[in-house]
Regions:
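Short, flexible segments with low predicted structural confidence
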Residues: 1, 28, 44-45, 61-66, ...
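Alpha-helix boundary recognition
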Residues: 7-8, 30, 61, 74, ...
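The conserved cystathionine-beta-synthase
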Residues: 15-34, 39-41, 79-98, 102-106
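Short beta-to-alpha loop/turn elements within the nucleotide-binding domains of ABC transporters
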Residues: 20, 51, 68, 85, ...
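Short beta->alpha transition motifs characteristic of CBS
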Residues: 34, 38, 46-62, 95-101, ...
Length: 115
């Protein structure tokens, strides 16, 4: 239960849907000031991964198509924990990430846990 109290719920987060373009995702990232945000499916329930501003900038600087779907640069698709995970598992999972996605008992996106 303690972990659940530390999680920022999805209703309080900036996210993008998997059907947005890289151009749209970059605008969301720039407007929010975050370096990355979660990518969710079209229903807003399933965590697909993260999109990083740095990867979009790199893609754009190399002349990449900004109309590609955000999923073309998706990262960290397997980096998530259960809301009921033990703290021991959390420490090892989050160490190289700005945050880790948290899934509920039905594997729906619940929110994020930050450092």
């Amino acid at each position: 239960m303690l972990l659940k109290s530390l999680v920022k719920p999805k209703e309080r987060l900036v996210t993008v849907r998997e059907d947005v373009t890289l151009e749209q995702a970059l605008k969301v990232l720039e407007d929010s000031g975050y370096r990355c945000v979660p990518i969710l499916d079209e229903t807003g329930q399933i965590f697909r991964g993260n999109i990083y501003k740095m990867h979009i900038y790199r893609h754009k600087s190399r002349g990449g198509d900004m109309q590609l779907p955000v999923t073309s640069l998706l990262k960290n698709a397997t980096k998530f924990i259960s809301v009921n995970a033990a703290f021991f598992n959390v420490f090892f999972s989050i160490k190289d990430l700005p945050y880790i996605a948290v899934l509920d008992d039905k594997n729906a996106f619940y929110g994020i846990l930050t450092h």
